[in-house]
Amino acid sequence: MDTSHTTKSCVLILLVALLCAERAQGLQCYECYGVPIETSCPAVTCRASDGFCIAQNIELIEDSQRRKLKTRQCLSFCPAGVPIRDPNIRERTSCCSEDLCNAAVPTAGSTWTMAGVLLFSLSSVVLQTLL
């Protein structure tokens, strides 16, 4: 009976250690910036402070031509936004917090302003520069 209790305790401790070790490795997200929509983005391990994977798709309409770009990255926050008022720009951003969850923007994703997108992109660059 004492051996059974010891075995169960060891299994429980091992399970907790494995769960903690997996999270200590950090969230994994896809990462690329302003690339054509069909481009594959590599997977990266985020910093411990980054708890969200961000997926952003932008469609620019210039002279009746459409360009579709995407950004994928790790961030420490999920950016909030305001609807875009420019009819030549369509943008969708989503955030999630599971490994490699930012492969695509969900169809029901939120709409953000270009100003909000630029602000969060700029802030991530500034943070990376400072760190």
Curated annotation (Swiss-Prot):
It is found in: Cell membrane. It is a lipid-anchor; GPI-anchor. Residues 110-131 form a propeptide. Residues 1-26 form the signal peptide. A lipid is attached at G109 (GPI-anchor amidated glycine). This is Lymphocyte antigen 6C1. GO terms for cellular component: cell surface; external side of plasma membrane. It comes from Mus musculus.
